[in-house]
């Protein structure tokens, strides 16, 4: 994965092309990103006002000029737990236009966690402070898959799953100090979250 999306279009192409050349010589596939997602990732902070949807024509040109194997696009998702201030909305029209131009290129969505309400509530009920956290509804993510998205990143949901259970364990029994107890609960919640995504949202079971 190479993300040079915070650079201008030509610089993004230049950096990505170098990575693709290096990786392909060694039999490694490359995912790149075009368009800007709001939020913070790897210490790169993009304000909501600076976020930018992916242009379908640029997406086609980007893939042709870089030779990248898969492309992460921006259609309204964002990094972190606060993805929408109002109603959730994704630009499926942009996604469809990109897939029409790049039918054989796997499309990726970053920042697409559901920010599962039950896990947010568990965090907040046990000493957490993440009011107003909101993500992409599962129904939208399922629709994205139906429109041709091949990979959906949901790191925030896994962070929430782990944190929610650790907070619950400590709140219910402050004397706990054995990592196996709180990490075990966290692991099971992560497993349940992943299973739910695979079976009910991405519908990807048995397709690896």
Predicted regions and their residues:
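Alpha/beta enzyme core
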Residues: 2-106, 117-122, 126-134, 138, ...
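C-terminal alpha-helical cap/extension of soluble enzyme domains
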Residues: 125, 136-208
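Short catalytic/ligand-gating loop segments at beta-alpha or beta-beta junctions
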Residues: 110-114
């Amino acid at each position: 994965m190479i993300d040079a999306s915070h650079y201008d279009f030509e610089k993004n192409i230049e950096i990505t092309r170098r990575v693709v050349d290096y990786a392909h010589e060694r039999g490694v596939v490359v995912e790149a990103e075009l368009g800007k997602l709001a939020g913070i990732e790897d210490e790169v902070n993009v304000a909501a006002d600076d976020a930018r949807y992916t242009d379908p024509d640029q997406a086609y040109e980007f893939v042709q000029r870089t030779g990248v194997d898969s492309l992460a696009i921006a259609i309204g998702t964002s990094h972190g737990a606060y993805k929408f201030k109002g109603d959730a909305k994704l630009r499926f029209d942009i996604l469809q236009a990109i897939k029409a131009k790049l039918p054989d290129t796997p499309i990726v969505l970053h920042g697409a966690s559901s920010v599962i309400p039950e896990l947010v509530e568990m965090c907040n009920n046990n000493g957490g402070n993440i009011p107003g956290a909101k993500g992409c509804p599962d129904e939208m993510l399922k629709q994205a898959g139906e429109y041709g998205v091949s990979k959906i990143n949901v790191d925030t949901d896994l962070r929430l799953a782990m944190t929610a259970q650790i907070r619950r364990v400590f709140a219910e029994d402050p004397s706990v100090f054995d990592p196996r107890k709180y990490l075990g609960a966290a692991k099971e919640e992560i497993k349940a979250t992943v299973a739910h995504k695979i079976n009910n949202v991405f519908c990807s079971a048995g397709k690896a």
